[in-house]
Amino acid sequence: MKFELQHTDTASDARAGLITTDHGQIKTPIFMPVGTCGSVKGVHFSELKEQVKAQIILGNTYHLYLRPGLDVLKAAGGLHKFNGWDRPILTDSGGFQVFSLTGIRKLKEEGCEFRSHIDGSKHFFTPENVMDTERIIGADIMMAFDECPPGKSDYNYAKKSLELTQKWLDRCFKRFNETEPLYGYQQSLFPIVQGCTYKDLRREAAKYVADKGADGNAIGGLAVGEPTEVMYEMIEVVNEILPKDKPRYLMGVGTPQNILEAIERGVDMFDCVMPTRNGRNAMLFTYEGTMNMRNKKWEMDFSPIDPDGCDVDKTYTKAYLHHLFKAQELLAMQIASIHNLAFYLRLVTDARQHIIAGDFTQWKSSIIDQLGRRL
């Protein structure tokens, strides 16, 4: 994987770049739709390409390990062959999912024992077998296995957690460097900066990660309940240290406002389930604000969902989408998911264009407040 830093905003740390993988190029800043089990919920790949304009999607190691399982994925020739997506894929290590299983997991220095949320069967993840699993899945970008401490962890727990994450990171890189890709194309490993909301721990973690010289670096453990301003502060602390010539990935974030604020602070890559999850619950993001399509106010509004959006937005009206949600038609969730994902991709594409044009901060300031309005 290669990263070319193409433009930097003169009034902020916002950047425009180009990531090149063996499955294609990714223009940054970029939003990556989440395909947890190998699919983006409710959206065909043809729609992801033509309507959403997705350049890269996510898969999740924990979920793919459980279903369909490694035997199926290996026999298929990896996730790209299995699901038919021929553009780049990034896989999360499954750490966040495993550590979310409160009460059904046991943490040890060797790794983490957990029970499947599907059938209760016991499993054990280590840095080594997670690297092996991600090799079998075959994503272009693999994430290191880390502990994801609760957002409100006290300092002592956060420090011990970071020490464990750093030990695991060393083991991840050792295993990654000892093994080869299975399917004839290159894979990259991104380490993850943890440290909760403690500046000194975040700085220590960022230095440790930067010293690995990886193809890119991730910031994890944010947007887990801490105040938004604290999240922005942690991003600033970390990005002062992470190398400027490598892409920076903020994991699991967030709202359109969050994304623009993070871009301004030097973040290049984003993922979040919010566009699809909120879409399935009738909440649509637009440049004017958010719309709850179940509200009666849309019942007689025969204007397009978004006249400046994708073809789906221009084809269907607000009144029709309101009707579909009231009637509990599956098409409602599909239309809303496509709209929201297309809007997120449009947002980061517009941000990139304004970074290149040199007026990103002015553009951001002109739209940031209205993005959060309820229409």
Segments from the language model and where they lie:
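Conserved, mostly hydrophobic/aromatic
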Residues: 24, 57, 92, 134, ...
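Glycine- and acidic
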Residues: 152-155, 159, 216-222, 330-333
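C-terminal extensions of enzymes
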Residues: 1-20, 26-33, 41-42, 146-152, ...
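A non-catalytic, amphipathic alpha-helix used as a structural packing/dimerization or gating element
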Residues: 129, 133-136, 160, 164-171, ...
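Glycine-rich phosphate/ribose-binding loops and adjacent secondary-structure elements
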Residues: 163-166, 175, 179, 184-305
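Short secondary-structure capping/turn micro-motifs that flank functional sites
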Residues: 65, 150-151, 225-226, 278-279, ...
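Generic secondary-structure signature for well-ordered alpha-helical cores
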Residues: 139, 170, 174-177, 240-243, ...
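Non-catalytic, usually N-terminal nucleic-acid engagement modules in DNA/RNA processing proteins
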Residues: 1-182, 296
